[in-house]
């Protein structure tokens, strides 16, 4: 879709959406986003220029359909896929990607840590019409084998290689500073971020500052070259309710706010990552603190999970917290699957995670009065009242699941025309009774005696 657009500006010195926006240019990507979100193109340009909205769109991912992340547009959801050292199958990852696209993931992150990472990533980008994000430290550690071998040069080479492939955003753990280590010691669960734990290990062994922080300007230069956005990772996100909103988390968040401004100076788009495990009554506070400390950059959050005991059902736990977070300003929800805390998700887990978080994001969009958000719900209400079963399946966030559950008890085609379902049957259907009542003429009512 974007091949001609990207070709036309391939020789521009800074081909980023933010650069064009700051210079008054409305790109085709901005126009497309404006149409999808039912907003004015100039408004989209202004938000991108201010850093309040990002359009993650690497110039080398030309089959990607433009989308936007920010408070002014509908809440988005991300789905994670990727191999592990114990389970690496490129075909399975492509199947997971297909599930992500089918059920409406707005972005996908390849978090592979095992197998041929370059080939897995190449295949995912080639088959994806949504932005692909990565966490470069995973490949860095995979390639160098030993964390002690990490150098800034190796780090930058890996990021550029992935940017050349078409990665549209990078999670960079640059806000975790050496001076925060004593704060981590006060926690019940320490560091639960994989990238954060690797950086902590490196800093403690070498007694040096975080190399991602030290090389942040060079990382921004690479991102500006390919219009890859930065997703500033929260290495110190709370992994349990006990650690939520603590000094470690907030100290890192303040640094992420500083890094956001530095990236903007280089015309690099930024979103900020957030928690994590957070009690329900602290979610609003966390959203407002990010807005304050990070200058209203889009907030991309994992959950948050308002309880620690939902193992096996954490896609539900996360969706509960995610709805509240999105209502108070989160711009994108990273899905959590039923396998969270338990193992590597399969395609079914991916589907369940996506749908639960699509529900959460959509509920927040309705509550916030976002343009067009409630229209699908109104259409569903009409279809239900008219017993239009096929239309109901079509309008559902998961049409396959809706049809499957209906057909468990009434599989024959004749029941797609029936004015009842298996719950109430033909005699106790409230919709049917209500429709019969509505047919009664007013003249049929007893007249009031004077």
From Swiss-Prot:
- Where does this protein act, in terms of pathway? Cofactor biosynthesis; thiamine diphosphate biosynthesis
Enzyme class (EC, first level): lyase
| Gene3D superfamilies xref list | 6.10.250.620, Radical SAM ThiC family, central domain
Q: Which InterPro entries match?
A: ThiC, ThiC/Bza_core_dom, ThiC/BzaA/B
Query: Where does the signal sequence lie?
Result: none
GO MF terms listed in the record are:
4 iron, 4 sulfur cluster binding; carbon-carbon lyase activity; zinc ion binding
User: Which residues are recorded as binding Zn(2+)?
Assistant: 277, 341
- Where, by residue number, does substrate bind? 80, 109, 138, 173, 193-195, 234-237, 273, 300
Q: What is its EC number?
A: 4.1.99.17
Q: Which UniProt keywords apply?
A: 4Fe-4S, Iron, Iron-sulfur, Lyase, Metal-binding, S-adenosyl-L-methionine, Thiamine biosynthesis, Zinc
**What reaction(s) does this enzyme catalyze?**
5-amino-1-(5-phospho-beta-D-ribosyl)imidazole + S-adenosyl-L-methionine = 4-amino-2-methyl-5-(phosphooxymethyl)pyrimidine + CO + 5'-deoxyadenosine + formate + L-methionine + 3 H(+)
GO biological process entries: thiamine biosynthetic process; thiamine diphosphate biosynthetic process
Pfam families in alphabetical order: ThiC_Rad_SAM
Query: Which Gene Ontology cellular-component terms appear in the entry?
Result: cytosol
Q: Which cofactor does it need?
A: [4Fe-4S] cluster
Q: How is the cofactor bound?
A: Binds 1 [4Fe-4S] cluster per subunit. The cluster is coordinated with 3 cysteines and an exchangeable S-adenosyl-L-methionine.
Domain of life of the source = Bacteria
Q: Where does [4Fe-4S] cluster bind?
A: 421, 424, 429
- Stated family: Belongs to the ThiC family.
Note the subunit structure. Homodimer.
User: What does this gene product do?
Assistant: Catalyzes the synthesis of the hydroxymethylpyrimidine phosphate (HMP-P) moiety of thiamine from aminoimidazole ribotide (AIR) in a radical S-adenosyl-L-methionine (SAM)-dependent reaction.
Q: What is this protein called?
A: Phosphomethylpyrimidine synthase
Q: Which organism is it from?
A: Campylobacter fetus subsp. fetus (strain 82-40)
Species classification:
Bacteria, Pseudomonadati, Campylobacterota, Epsilonproteobacteria, Campylobacterales
Gene responsible for this protein: thiC
């Amino acid at each position: 879709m974007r091949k001609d657009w990207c070709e036309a500006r391939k020789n521009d010195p800074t081909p980023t959406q933010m650069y064009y926006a700051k210079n008054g240019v409305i790109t085709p990507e901005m126009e497309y986003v404006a149409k999808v979100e039912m907003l004015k193109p100039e408004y989209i340009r202004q938000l991108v220029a201010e850093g309040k909205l990002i359009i993650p769109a690497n110039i080398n991912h030309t089959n990607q359909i433009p989308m936007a992340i920010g408070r002014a547009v509908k809440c988005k959801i991300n789905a994670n896929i990727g191999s592990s050292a114990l389970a690496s199958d490129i075909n399975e990852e492509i199947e997971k990607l297909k599930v992500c696209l089918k059920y409406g993931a707005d972005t996908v992150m390849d978090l592979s840590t095992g197998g041929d990472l370059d080939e897995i990533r190449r295949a995912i980008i080639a088959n994806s019409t949504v932005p692909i994000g990565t966490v470069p430290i995973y490949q860095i550690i995979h390639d160098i084998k030993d964390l002690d071998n990490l150098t800034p040069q190796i780090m930058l080479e890996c990021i550029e290689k992935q940017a050349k492939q078409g990665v549209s955003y990078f999670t960079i753990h640059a806000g975790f500073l050496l001076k925060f280590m004593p704060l981590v010691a006060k926690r019940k669960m320490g560091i639960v971020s994989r990238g954060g734990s690797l950086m902590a290990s490196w800093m403690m062994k070498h007694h040096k500052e975080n190399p991602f922080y030290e090389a942040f300007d060079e990382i921004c230069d690479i991102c500006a070259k390919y219009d890859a956005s930065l997703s500033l990772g929260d290495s110190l996100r709370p992994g349990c309710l006990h650690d939520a909103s603590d000094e470690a988390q907030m100290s890192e968040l303040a640094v992420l706010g500083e890094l956001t401004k530095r990236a903007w100076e280089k015309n690099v788009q930024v979103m900020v990552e957030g928690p994590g495990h957070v009690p329900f009554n602290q979610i609003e506070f966390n959203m407002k603190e990010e807005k304050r400390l990070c200058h209203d950059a889009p907030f991309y959050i994992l959950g948050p999970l308002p309880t620690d005991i939902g193992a096996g059902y954490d896609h539900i736990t996360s969706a509960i917290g995610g709805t509240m977070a999105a209502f108070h300003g989160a711009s994108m929800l990273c899905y959590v699957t039923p396998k969270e805390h338990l193992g590597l998700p399969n395609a079914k887990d991916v589907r369940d995670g996506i749908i639960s978080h699509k529900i959460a994001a959509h509920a927040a969009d309705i509550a916030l009065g976002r343009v067009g958000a409630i229209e699908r719900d109104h259409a569903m209400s009409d279809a239900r009242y008219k017993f239009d079963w096929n239309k109901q399946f079509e309008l559902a966030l998961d049409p396959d699941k809706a049809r499957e559950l209906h057909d468990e008890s009434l599989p024959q085609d004749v029941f797609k025309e029936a004015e009842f379902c298996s719950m109430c049957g033909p005699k106790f259907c409230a919709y049917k009774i209500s429709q019969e009542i509505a047919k009664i003429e007013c003249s049929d009512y007893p007249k009031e005696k004077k």
